Amino acid sequence: MNRSVVAALCLAVLASSASAQSFGGQNQPPDQWVMNCNMEKGRDCTVSAMIDGGPNNLLGTFLIVSYSVAYTTLTVVVDGVGQRAAMQVDEWPWVSTGICTGGACSFDQQKSSDLLQALLKGQRMVVQASLQDDSMAGPLPMSLSGFATQYQRAVRAQQAK
């Protein structure tokens, strides 16, 4: 059941991100940063990427990393029930989440702010998550190319009336 919920969330993020990107006429594949605005509970523009585990990881391994401009929170969505997620930008130390609810592990506001600055300036990040069944997703690498551009688009869209 949790796998279905995460898969549905992943599809919703990708579908809404692809529609937000339709001005360029391109759908966004995994491993690319996209901007999306959701109006369900008030305007919330996010920058997110679905990081595919690729051929060197377990079949179907993926994580979604998403930064909410409205809530100024960085979240890692896992396929399963998360216990903890961690992120490393370039050669900086690993930073871990303190809050996991279901498949979503969020960094607190201070860590989210610090990581946002690192993501804006960095070249590459690595994300991993430990799950309640003691399995591990990752470490999964992701380029930060395009993150800053999509973040600026999200900020402008968030401020639009």
For the regions a protein language model found, what residue spans apply to each?
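Bacterial N-terminal signal peptides
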Residues: 7-16
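Bacterial N-terminal signal peptides that target proteins for export
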Residues: 1-7
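A generic "folded-domain core" signal
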Residues: 20-161
